[in-house]
Amino acid sequence: RVVESSEEPETVNMRRAEWRTNKCKFTIMVSVATDREDKDPVNAAKKLLDEAEAKGVDELRREKDEWYRNFWSNSFVKLGDDYLENIYYLHRYLMSAGSRGEFPLAFNGGLWRWNRDVLNWGTPHHWNQQQEYWGLCAQNDWRLMKPYLDTYFKMIPFAEKLAKEYGAEHDALLITEAHNFNGVQWGKDKRYLRNNFTPASQIASLFWDYYEFTGDEEFLKERAY
């Protein structure tokens, strides 16, 4: 949407739209919605734009700047080497940009990748996605862990069922190497994945990290344990 414009974009085809104006400077707002969030994603996307336009660009920028000001104040490193320090801050930025919604960081590269927007797959998620979350709690970015941890909480019904298939009848979870966003154990029937269960203990350590750095006993008692 072009802010404060009386002209309407013209749809050329399903992949292209055009908007013509004599203005030299203008503001474009973009929203994204899918039928997972709303059965009518077009109207849902328009509603997001209406809310954003009503709030105004200046207020949106102020909110964004305030969020990042608080975020950057959470931690810092001083290593005496600009290159290494910048890697630390770059990773923090990548995680803040991609791990604040309902889902964890996009698998196999995250939100921003070196090869533009080329992504070989977005799901299933494999266990080695955990490496993106190593150290988040230690650097005081534990809030960014929530989408990752919630993904595994969604797996509980599927993991319980799989454990029973392997003979564990009560209070057992069996998590495979790969899974879908909704918790389905995608790797359980894959010949090259079905017997790889060691990732479960490594993933569990991230739940302990979250408790250890936050001291959230309710999380430990009611959810993780």
What are the residue ranges of the model-derived segments?
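Acidic/polar, glycine-enriched structural segments that form the non-catalytic walls/loops
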Residues: 1-122, 142-145, 152-161
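Helix-terminus loop motifs that line ligand-binding clefts
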Residues: 95, 99-127, 134-205, 211-214, ...
